[in-house]
Amino acid sequence: MPKIPAGMRKKPGGGYEYRFTVRGRRYSVYGKSVRECTEKAERRRREIEAGINRAGKALTLDEYFLRWESARTGSVRDSTLRTERYIYRIAADVEADGAPRLGALSLDEISRQHLVLVQTGLRRAYSISTINRCMSVIKAILESALEERLILWNPSKGLRMLKDTKKPPRETIHRALTPEETQAFFYAAEQRGSWYLPLYRFLLNTGCRFGEAGALLPGDISEDSICIRRTLTKSLDGKLIIGSDAKTGHSARMIPARRAALAAVREQRDKNTRCFGDEEDKPIFRAPRGGLLGARCVKKDIDQLCEAAGIERFSAHAFRDTFATRAVESGMQAKTLQEILGHADIGITMNLYAHVMESTKRRQMDAVEVLPGAALSII
């Protein structure tokens, strides 16, 4: 009787089972004898190896991306899928050192060196954060291909992300405005007759995200609340569209309507009627020619108004930060603010509290009188 090799066992009911591993994945074959079981295992090993090689050569990265995306549909948000498509296309269209574009390469042709060259190529036109997002998506796709045994290894494993030496947005143009800056900015906007003035007033009085405001329809506004259902996003080809849902599940929310916010809505709707007619199915806040709000055009307008007002420039997100800052300073509860802002995690809101309190800590510390009437120094 042949000796039973390691990995094989005799089954209680008769016959043999042979367990073996190929590249981290376990397989089993069964036979009536040791010899039959051994032969089946060898044949199965060859089939597995051949299958891996054939699959890796047959599928291009573009083809596998469609398969990967299809498998994720329904388990992740539509807005996430749209963003991943857009980011993937940026990376997939790169041609490094005369080689075919990344998306046209078969899975087994993609090497670590090729991905490094793609990183380098992207630096000519994109920010560090965008490049890192591109490489994160490529890494996730290749990791999925590895799990399906379509490639023998993930060439992006260990690939270092680029270091972003820029200051965090909150330390530059992503900030809250002081009361003096707010007053100067809106005075300049009124004097120059900015088309976007109602939008700025609305953002400041609701804490909405720019994309959420740009996707609001007349039916989303009532006398006592504002319903956030969707946001502006980009399609696969980079075209600006209104998404079918909000940024996240927590982003879909009802905001109590302040009088100033409702006044801004009425002002914008009056302008829309004069310029475009009465269109109930179109967004409230639009571009001067009636299209969807473009971030670049709004940024340009804000920059011009900041220059006219003599204040440091900021982004449209600063209106949201300003609303949140004033809310914290007014004593609004963290949970309430989380719901109004649509933060997915209370930790995000608490970080905002910490940031606001850092700026007011010295003023409040100076106001504390530990020993009434005591000298400044008791040592």
List PLM regions with ranges:
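C-terminal secondary-structure termini that scaffold catalytic or DNA-interacting sites
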Residues: 1, 234-236, 241-252, 259-261, ...
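N-terminal DNA-binding module of tyrosine recombinases/phage integrases
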Residues: 9-17, 21-113, 270-280, 358
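N-terminal core-binding DNA-recognition domain of tyrosine site-specific recombinases/integrases
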Residues: 26-34, 70-155, 171, 291-297, ...
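C-terminal catalytic core of Y-nucleophile DNA break-rejoin enzymes
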Residues: 34, 171, 225, 243-267, ...
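Short, basic (Lys/Arg/His-rich) helix/loop patches that form interaction surfaces
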Residues: 97, 187-197, 206, 255, ...
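Basic, Lys/Arg- and aromatic-enriched nucleic-acid-binding interface segment
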Residues: 128, 132, 136, 147, ...
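Conserved tyrosine-mediated DNA breakage-rejoining catalytic core shared by Y-recombinases
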Residues: 158-164, 215-270
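Catalytic-site neighborhood detector that most strongly recognizes the C-terminal catalytic loop/helix
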Residues: 231-234, 341-366
